[in-house]
Amino acid sequence: LTSHSVTLVYMKSYMVQQKSKTALDQVKQYHEQTKHEFNRYARSLGYLDWANQPNPFRRFDGAPLIPLPHLTLDEDPLSPSYESLFHPHSIPSQPVTLNSLSRFFEYALSLTAWKAYNGTRWALRSNPSSGNLHPTEGYVFTRSLDELALEPGLYHYAPKEHGLEHRWALPPELAQSMLQGIPSEGFLVGLTSIHWREAWKYGERAFRYCQHDIGHAIGTLRIAAATLGWNLLVLS
């Protein structure tokens, strides 16, 4: 009984101590704990557990997959020049169709190549990632659009198949009300992180790398949008 009492008191004291810290204090503590020093690296696992390597591709059981058309060499309209991406309104805005949405994701989050070595095969993607671990997942939330052959709702982008998994179907009226304030021809893109994909290699620094990867994904999404004459606005 004494042992249990001591444990409970200790845990209670620890919890009170944690609650007394502000969110900023916790952030500072995390960064202090996980930073590299001039004379040493931050703590890490020290090895890679290959038997438990995370799956780099997320799929949802039972979710219908809508294939997206891949880009072709004679794609119309042709991809604009790199310089023109930095001149607002120089690229005509394309309607939101299945083809343009496909190009958007292919430029931003898709697979770009496969590599193989000693019997191991892995993919490269258009968005850079620390350790090529790719914790970032992309989603699109849309209402009924005149030229977009998709039901209103939430979709998950599956890069391996280059398709959209239908995750949540919504009545058109509800989808419209949920997207109030978004331009009539606009849609929402969401990004999430699977932290285990990073923690498997980088341990407690994984949260840092996940935020870094989100930044890379926002960058490629912004460039992909610009090639279509679209404007990407980061909400949160």
Residue positions per predicted region:
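N-terminal accessory segments that position/regulate proteins before the catalytic core
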Residues: 4-236
